[in-house]
Amino acid sequence: PIGDIVLATNSNRTIADFLATGHYETRPSIRTLASAMDVGAPSNMERLRHLFPDFGSLRTAVECYPVHDQAIRFQIAKDYSRFGRLWCPHTATGFWVYDNLPESRRLDKAWIVVATAHPAKFNNIVQGIVNLQEIEIPPPLASLLELPVQFESLGTELEAFGEALARWDN
């Protein structure tokens, strides 16, 4: 039921390079505006290779394009100006790739661009790009941010993790 699968990534272009060359090589992560994509050794590569054991079928089914920080900034500003909508940096990568597909391809079918997070989660980035004093936080997110922070520091031993899980389960 799904047509084209077009992925967007940031300057950490491990998957884009793999799909372009067929050669998978991990590398150090590069820090970018789209921080959740700052991965030089993507953990989902094993899943991707399992779903598509034949590289040719993977390359036919999936495309991936890297989007650099300058393009992320441009897309956030452009779409805010055009539509009055704000994107988080991750969502902006998807819209940048979509906007840069050939027009005939974009108009040929319906597309879905997957949004990752609310821009308020990245207000320190987005506010400066669109010159806003404040990004309105939606009530559900605001209520989560008001909850007390709870965490427990654990040692690096597996036993410490098991003990913490046992305490949490009770």
Tell what function each PLM region has.
Residues 1-170:
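PLP-dependent amino-acid enzyme catalytic core
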